[in-house]
Amino acid sequence: MGVFGALQADKWISAHNKPDDIFLQGTPTVYGKARSINADPLPAPSFDFRDAAKRAMPSVVSVDRFDKMRGFMESQATERETGTGSGVIVSADGIIVTNNHVVAGHTTRNGTEVFPRVQVRLYDGQKVEAKVLGTDPRSDLAVLKIEAKNLKAIELGNSSTLEVGEWVMAVGNPLGFDNTVSVGVVSSTKRNLPVGEQGLVEGIQTDAAINPGNSGGALCNAQGQLIGINSAIASGTGESVGIGFAIPVDRAKKVVNDIVKYGKAKYPVLGIEYLGQLAGHLDDPQAREYIASVIHRDDFPTTGLYIKAVSGPSVGSGITAGDFLLEVEGQKIDTTFDLNKVLLPKKIGDKIKVKYWHAGQTKQVTIALEESQTNI
């Protein structure tokens, strides 16, 4: 089941008195624990989130996209609203984070990415045109910029300190209902979801109700601090069934800072191009027949990634087209998601051990990771 997308930089930074990062490093102010509505000294089963909601809601916006489309019997394309989601103001000068699938554009023949027109509706109802600074399909995040006064940036929390069972609050605009709050608990802090080509690595799972339109909204702790960006729900019906997911704010910080500075998120890459459609299917008879016709042998592995081409750091390593990637840093690689899990915490320049199959032999090499030149 496809979770992501199933629901729904220009140089604006002044050189004067601007921090390098949108997300400042430091310890955020803690306003204290949410008030228990049960006077019993034992752990209370419910909490009062009124203060948390008051702090977070003004920073959550509605995000509407408009595309030019031509209807039946129409000679010309007209602009229509084609999708909606939520977003979170993370900087008082107009930086908003939302989901990639909410505002994703398309790539032209010359490689230029074209984005739809995006309009943001603020907490007070004001509508403002937004510019897409950049998107990151790997994390399902996108960054917008708006020009407006008196914006309230949400306070940032720390997703690395989250614990299972901790109370959280989802804020967004589900099903067209603006400024909606739902409450639940953290069900898992490092949930891996191998969906789509990239998958969700170490996401936050919660039972707080997340419905269509919540995508890109805020997941907050009991103090109203941002701990995650709501991404999707695992439901075949498209309605909340108590399983929602969010991208940890610690990851969002890096992605947003990269997009604002460079126009894209920076990732380390191994420099191999593989046939994604064959990933996880090397034991399939038709897949094996196809590969055998290309490499002219049939004794290749039944697991791993079939390498179509090499570039960057893998050039000269001994790895060639027709080889199979077996392990990275001791972790078996059978799908693109397996590879993403291993590479995500790595940095550009890190040296990693790679085990691969070449012409009937298993070999190992150390490769220094380089920066990805693409946005996927």
Where are these regions (language model features)?
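C-terminal recognition in membrane/secretory proteostasis and scaffolding
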Residues: 1-25, 117, 221-222, 226, ...
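Active-site loop architecture of trypsin-fold serine endopeptidases
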Residues: 8, 80, 102-110, 151, ...
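N-terminal activation segment of mature serine protease catalytic domains
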Residues: 9-74, 86, 92, 163, ...
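A conserved glycine-rich beta-strand in the N-terminal activation segment of trypsin-fold
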Residues: 41-51, 70-95, 127-129, 153-155, ...
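Terminal peptide-recognition signature
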Residues: 58-64, 87, 94, 98, ...
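Flexible glycine-/small-residue-rich
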Residues: 63-67, 122-124, 134-136, 145-148, ...
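Gly/Ser-enriched beta-turn/beta-hairpin loop segments
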Residues: 69-80, 108-111, 123, 133-139, ...
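Conserved active-site neighborhood of the chymotrypsin/trypsin-like protease fold
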Residues: 84, 91-179, 327, 332-337, ...
